[in-house]
Amino acid sequence: MTAPADHEANHGIPERLAKHTVRYANCKDVNAADLTPMMRHYVQVKQEYPHALLLYRVGDFFETFFEDGITIARELELVLTSKECGKVVGRVPMAGIPHHALDRYCIQLVEKGYAIAICDQVEDPAQAQGLVKREVTRVITPGTVIEEGMLSARRNNFLAAVVLAGQSWGLAYADVSTGEFFTTQHTDPEQVGQELMRLQPSETLFPTDAPDLRAMLRPGEASDHLPECLPRQFCYTLRSQGSFSHTEARQRLLQTFRLRSLEGIGCDHLPLAVRAAGGLLEYLEDTQKDTQVPLQLLSTYVLSDFLVLDHQTRRNLEITQTSRDGTYNGSLLWSLDRTVTAMGGRALRRWLLQPLLSVDKIRDRQSTLQELVDDGSFRTALQQQLKQIYDLERLAGRAGSGTANGRDLVALADSFARLPVLAALVEAVESPYLKALQHVPPELEKLGDTLRSHLVESPPLYLTEGNLIRPGVNADLDTLRDQVKGDQGWIAKLEPAERDRTGISTLKVGFNKAFGYYISISRSKSDQAPDDYIRKQTLTNEERYITPELKEREARVFNTQDEIHKLEYEIFQQLRELVGQHADLIRQVAQGVAAADVLAGLAEVAIYQGYCRPDMGDHREIAIADGRHPVVEQLLPAGFFVPNSTELGGEKSFGQGEIGQAHGQDANQDTNAEPNHGQDARPNPATQPPSHPTPLTPSPPHPLYPDLIILTGPNASGKSCYLRQVGLIQLMAQVGSFVPASAARLGICDRVFTRVGAVDDLATGQSTFMVEMNETANILNHASDRSLVLLDEIGRGTATFDGLSIAWSVAEYLASEIRARTIFATHYHELNELAGILDNVANYQVTVKEMPDQIVFLHQVRPGGADRSYGIEAGRLAGLPPTVIQRAREVMTQIEKHSKIAVGLRKGAEFSGNGRRRKRRSVQEDPAEQLDIFSS
């Protein structure tokens, strides 16, 4: 396409079209009266949908004109041409797509953040008098897609709506394809952005009084009408404030769900949540036209019912995608996803992004997992049955919206047939999640029987092709089919009969769409054609004829087939409407199937990866024996991952892992031990499947688990992996999963915070250090003593003394004021001094083995603080030139000889705070009198 400069030079007209006297690139610039009738109608429709790309049906193509033609040609890499639109206007830009390729091109446009208005022909062009009647039959936006080919099977496609009022906000979101519909309200403005980041909506509605109320902001586009608290990476549609009126929104919800009050769905006292939900419903009415969107009854949720994971934590823990390249492979979801249904895949993603806070609910999931782990043959049989169930949620959604085809309904019928088999399979189970499958709604059994008795086993893809309905379903349909068979039989016998009558052995009866049925005779025999033959076409080697009786039979076949297709479609519509009436019931069953699928998959992972069932409780303790990173261990050869234990936040010391056993030992005792290359690193899952939690045996006496661990060690030794490992184990446990450890006892966390790595934020002009400080400030302002905080390299993006000072004060604040369970990885070895000041701080290190000419990373976490980072060795391993490595060693020797960084602490008053500690020796606040903190 042409560069932007070319567009500007020609008033928006690409250079190639400017050469062809195209004067108007925007339909707003033309006088409608000067256009041809069809183009006048196009402009009228475009004015009604200025925010959307208008696809206008003309024959076998969907055409676009003016600015939309330029946009579509550019985005889809199509040929941009022009069309004559009248003497005054002349030619205008045009691009088109074949009608049969509509879905394929719409997918590309929707993925780029465009809305599309489909203006289709609503009458037969052959019967039209004058201009063919056209109407907008559908508006496709990123958040309202229901077509199967435009959706990812294993993730939701959410449409969201946000209403702000002061510091409070309301949020509603729905998946049009599955019918899910939720709303909430909160008073923390920072949380609205975090909730949108969790949902990753394809489109978000926002009320504004902006002049262009129908503007759609594509991802990254700026607008003065969009508040700072809303993330810019999403697609936003600006709507009128009136669309979110509380009175109208409330009335719309009551009418849609046939309610007398909103009290029963929990949002009667949440006006902003009601406004957001009502505004979302109005948008669906505007975009879906006559297509009904069967949403489930609105459900109200509360953010405080779930473990809070902010965007930074989801990114750093790589829950659904990797932080490096944003891919699925290598994420926690990838490592745990053994689901066999699309519904289960979507449910697992939701579970991982919304871990539970209720111990009882977590234990319900664990109980189900335990049954599935203990009985491998039962789990295998269950998964085999689940594999045969199609995507009930989206099939019900398409049926309810009137877009399901014959294959969709057959898939539903086949799925319903598996439900009684599933019910019999889980008849004796006790766990609540599997008990949900024991009851098969009789309405669905009856519906499945109806669908199977009416529809053929393999219906065609398109409803207009016929052959949908079985014989014997409708007497009129059977009669019409018999008539067609009779007439087609007559035509089939015509060829041998005419050969006998005419004596022309090469005579044939053929058919094409242009002429219908005809009789073909070679030109050399054309003089033998009977007088009742009517010549229709002359070709190089043959003459084509018709007869009155042949045309009569042909007309009867065509007319009867039209009647058959019409009647079949009517019967199919009745079946589809019947399915739509049961959409809510189908979705209830789908939710039970999805949950069972998730838990069966988690059980499979637990078996093959050697996971244990964590002992969950409402306390602050985090005790993990032989913990492992769930993703990294799957990426390494079996047994190569070195497990490590963790103890945080408890009142007693338990554990049979390295940390628990090592209390009271010298930190350097094991540093020269041989590295563990994987032998016996974790239980063999084939011989030791996880069952009930392994009791953690008491270790040597220790006053408490620390609230904060200062973790030091070499570069590339595995500190960041260890931090993520602890966070992922806690998250998995609160999802209800078993965890990669030999034993674990875990208290509920209200939030998990991570600050692991940082990069410049060029979009907002923030440096690496400023990004780091913003994330750290967020943690300090929101963490509680029930939070888990994982910090890596705080203060590294600025001068050494500044960074050390900040790291010290942050660690001190977390341990003494907040008392959050914290692991603080750092290369500031001076922070080891904190363990001698605050008695809820402990030092641990990732050990190495020193060899004469190299170091070996052992990846083992042991008590005690490291005094070296071995950064030069890490540089050598990374491939820095030998001369650079040698020079670095020389410089380091000189620095160590002439400089000493020491923290001068002097005795002071007892520090007042919540942490348990010895008397604190504090730095004198008066700079003139304080000791040298960083003396040289």
Q: Which residues does each PLM region occupy?
A:
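Intrinsic disorder/low-complexity segments
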Residues: 2, 7-13, 18-19, 25, ...
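Charged catalytic and DNA/RNA-contacting regions of genome-maintenance
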Residues: 2-6, 11-371, 387, 391-400, ...
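Active-site phosphate-binding and catalytic loops of NTP-dependent enzymes
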Residues: 119, 142-151, 291, 429-433, ...
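Conserved phosphate-binding elements of NTP-dependent enzyme cores
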Residues: 40, 44, 594, 830
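Charged, surface-exposed helical/loop "interaction arms" that form contiguous linear patches used
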Residues: 401, 405, 415-418, 471-472, ...
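Amphipathic heptad-repeat alpha-helical coiled-coil/stalk segments that mediate oligomerization
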Residues: 244-249, 308, 323, 414-489, ...
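Extended, charged coiled-coil "arm/hinge" scaffolds of SMC/Rad50-like chromosome-maintenance ATPases
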Residues: 539, 543-576
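ATPase nucleotide-binding head domains, primarily ABC-like/P-loop NTPase cores
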Residues: 66-67, 270, 340, 351, ...
